[in-house]
């Protein structure tokens, strides 16, 4: 018996990295999973990798029309949601004196605004007793130089969780934040050279980056009844980086 048997999960940004690993694990544990992403090729590849009990919807989590289409698809195919993982996000470096309006708006547009409206538009379909969690970042805890916009856009999510759990308590919907540190994903490979990756690893007490599957197991915990008494919390999964 799987931990998510009969459940319906929606994962934004579910076409790569830790969210894709989570989507695959959720299906293995009995869920039907809806994943969304902007790039059709990546969406098709993710569906093929997961292999079963998955529906892909192309769209941008910062675009409200795309969000409407995502949840209309969920409504037509399954009628309700038990788990929502908002993992669509973006970020780039920028020194304080060089941050542009476009940089700020695009980062907050997806990480903060997109997250809020994803949750808002999911709520009419949500079963009471469900689980919502958002992907944070330990950048909001560590103060890495040149990451102020990204860090601030992720810190928003802890505030969301604290407020929303109060608003949703009568429906027994839990709201948490899953906060990874450095994880070896295709995005990391794209953003950072080997020297930068080695520098990041030097900050991690265990000496190596995390793997998507290590984050996925924590996501499964938050999605399942194993975390039934966990609400309004930020679970930091970064190999101890934020603690030292």
Task: Walk through the language-model features, giving the residues of each.
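Active-site helix of classical SDR
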Residues: 119, 153, 161
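C-terminal substrate-recognition "lid" of short-chain dehydrogenase/reductases
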Residues: 125, 209-237, 242-243
